[in-house]
Curated annotation (Swiss-Prot):
Organism: Arthroderma otae (strain ATCC MYA-4605 / CBS 113480) (Microsporum canis)
Protein name in the entry: Probable carboxypeptidase MCYG_07204
Broadest EC class assigned to this enzyme: hydrolase
UniProt entry tagged with the keyword Signal: yes
EC numbers, comma separated: 3.4.17.-
Cofactor entry: Zn(2+)
Signal peptide range in chain numbering: 1-21
Family: Belongs to the peptidase M20A family.
One term of GO molecular function: peptidase activity
CDD domains tied to this protein: M20_ArgE_DapE-like_fungal
Transmembrane segments: none
UniProt xrefs under InterPro entries: Bact_exopeptidase_dim_dom, Peptidase_M20, Peptidase_M20_dimer, Peptidase_M20A
Length: 455
C-alpha cells in the first residue's frame, strides 16, 4: 500500500515537471507560450538546451553568422566564404562587385589568382554611397568548427547562448551585423544608399583593403566609414601604430668542441633581442621608443626566434621576428631608434660587427640584417562623437590605415561585438546577447551617419 502510494506520488511529480517545461517552451519567434516564464522579456527568456539551434535558425542575423563561421576562410583562402556572401547579398537585391586580390609568395613575387577577392555591394545603381560599412572575411588559423554551448545548468537565458568557432568574433560577427544593419537601413531609408565592403587578407598585411583603396571603387564620395572589429561594443577613439621587422644574424659554423673556430649567431642575437625587448620601457632621451597619454607606452613582442642546426654545431644563422605597437611618433623615427639600438649592442659585443638594412631577398651585405616590413604606420585617431557608447582605445592593428581617404570631412568609426582577448585563441566565442547588441550598435552608428546625409 505504502509502495503504491509513493509510486503514484512520483508519477504525479514527474508529470508536473513535464507540464512546467512545456509551459516555458520557447517558440521560434523568441517568445513564450506561457506568461509564467518572464525574466526580462523576449531578449532574456529562459530556454532549454535542445532549443539553442532553434534560436539561431529563427534569427536572420544569427543564422547568417552561423553560415559564415561554418565556412573555412583562413587568409589567402577566402574564396568559398566570398562566394557564399555574394550569393546572399544578391538574394537581398544588392548589386555586388567582385574585386580580385593578388597575393605575394615567399619570395615577394606577385601571384594572380581567383581564389580570393573583395566584395563591394550597394543598392541598385548607387555605386558611390555616402555611408560604407566594412569588415574582413579572412581569419587566422587554425579552423575551429561552429558550436553552441551554455552555462552549466538545465536551462539558461537566451542571451547567454555561447557561439564558438574560428571567426565568430574576428570578424564574422561584424560582417553579419553590418549586413543586417544595412538591410534595416535601406528598408527605412531607401533613398539614402549605403555600401558594404568586405575585404580579404586583413590578418596578413591588409592587401585586400590596399587593393580596394587604390582602385576605381574608392570613389571618395563617402562621408562616413564604419569599420568592424571586436571592440566589446565600445567606440574606439584610436589605435596604436605598427612597425614590424625581421632580425637575421650571420655567424660562422664550427665544431662545438672548438667554438673559438667559429662565431655563434645565436650568442650574438640574444643580447640584441634583450635590448630590443626593453625599448618601450626606456625614455626617448635614453634611446627608447615614445609613449603617450592616450595610448600608453610602445610595446614590442619577439614573436618568433630560431637558430642553429644542432647542439654540437656553432650556429651559422639566427632569426627573430618582432612586432612593435607604436604609442606615439613617426614610424620612420621608430625604425631609426631600433636600428641604432641594434647597432650599439652589436658593435659593443664585437667591434667589427656590421649592421645593415636589407629587403631580405638579396645576398647579405653585413653580419646583421634588419628587414623592416612593408606595413608601417603611426597611431590612428578615430571618431567617437556618437552618444550612447563607451569610448576606448585599442592596441591591435586594423585595416583603417590601408584605406586612402579623400577629403578632410570623413568620419571614421571603429566598432563591433565581441572581445579581442579571445579573437585568435582556441576559445574564440561570443554570446547571442553580444551579437544582437552589436547589431543595435551598428544601427545607431548608421542613424548618426544619416543625419550627416540629411543635415
Amino acid at each position: 500500500m505504502q509502495k503504491t502510494y509513493l509510486l503514484a506520488l512520483l508519477v504525479s511529480s514527474l508529470a508536473s515537471v513535464r507540464s512546467l517545461a512545456d509551459q516555458t517552451r520557447l517558440d521560434l519567434g523568441g517568445s513564450f507560450d506561457s506568461t509564467d516564464s518572464a525574466d526580462g522579456g523576449s531578449d532574456n527568456v529562459m530556454i532549454q538546451k535542445s532549443e539553442m539551434n532553434e534560436v539561431i535558425a529563427s534569427s536572420e542575423l544569427l543564422s547568417l553568422h552561423r553560415s559564415l563561421v561554418e565556412i573555412k576562410s583562413i587568409s589567402d583562402n577566402e574564396q568559398a566564404v566570398g562566394e557564399f556572401l555574394i550569393d546572399y547579398l544578391d538574394s537581398k537585391n544588392f548589386t555586388v562587385e567582385m574585386q580580385y586580390v593578388d597575393f605575394d609568395d615567399d619570395t615577394g613575387k606577385t601571384i594572380r589568382s581567383p581564389r580570393r577577392f573583395n566584395i563591394f555591394a550597394y543598392p541598385g545603381n548607387n555605386a558611390s554611397p555616402g555611408i560604407i560599412l566594412t569588415s574582413h572575411i579572412d581569419t587566422v588559423p587554425p579552423f575551429i568548427p561552429y558550436s553552441l554551448s551554455h552555462p552549466a545548468s538545465t536551462s539558461l537565458k537566451r542571451d547567454d547562448i555561447l557561439i564558438s568557432g574560428r571567426g565568430t568574433v574576428d570578424d564574422k560577427a561584424s560582417v553579419a551585423c553590418q549586413v543586417i544593419a544595412a538591410m534595416d537601413h535601406l528598408e527605412k531609408h531607401p533613398d539614402i544608399p549605403i555600401g558594404l565592403l568586405f575585404v580579404v587578407s586583413e590578418e596578413v598585411g591588409g592587401k585586400g583593403m590596399s587593393t580596394f583603396s587604390n582602385s576605381r571603387l574608392n570613389s571618395g564620395t563617402y562621408h562616413t566609414i564604419i569599420f568592424g572589429e571586436p571592440t566589446e561594443g565600445a567606440l574606439v577613439a584610436g589605435h596604436k601604430g605598427m612597425v614590424s621587422f625581421t632580425l637575421r644574424v650571420h655567424g660562422k659554423p664550427a665544431h662545438s668542441g672548438y667554438p673559438w673556430l667559429g662565431r655563434s649567431a645565436v650568442s650574438e642575437i640574444i643580447p640584441i633581442l634583450a635590448e630590443v625587448d626593453r625599448l618601450g620601457d626606456i625614455p626617448v632621451s635614453q634611446g627608447g621608443l615614445p609613449s603617450s597619454e592616450k595610448y600608453g607606452r610602445t610595446t614590442l613582442n619577439i614573436g618568433f626566434m630560431s637558430g642553429g642546426v644542432a647542439s654540437n654545431v656553432v650556429a651559422e644563422e639566427a632569426v627573430a621576428k618582432v612586432a612593435v605597437r607604436l604609442a606615439a611618433g613617426d614610424p620612420e623615427d621608430a625604425k631609426d631608434i631600433i636600428f641604432r639600438a641594434i647597432r650599439n649592442v652589436a658593435t659593443k659585443n664585437r667591434n667589427d660587427a656590421t649592421v645593415v638594412l636589407s629587403n631580405g631577398h638579396e645576398r647579405p651585405k653585413g653580419d646583421i640584417e634588419i628587414i623592416f616590413g612593408l606595413e608601417a604606420y603611426g597611431v590612428i585617431d578615430l571618431d567617437s562623437d556618437v552618444d550612447g557608447f563607451n569610448v576606448t582605445t585599442v592596441n591591435y592593428g586594423t585595416d583603417v590605415p590601408h584605406w586612402k581617404i579623400y577629403g578632410d570631412n570623413v568620419k571614421r568609426y571603429l566598432y563591433g561585438p565581441g572581445t579581442i582577448f579571445v579573437a585568435h585563441g582556441k576559445n574564440e566565442a561570443l554570446t547571442v546577447g553580444e551579437m544582437e547588441a552589436g547589431l543595435e550598435g551598428y544601427k545607431k552608428l548608421v542613424a548618426k551617419a544619416v543625419e550627416r546625409e540629411r543635415p
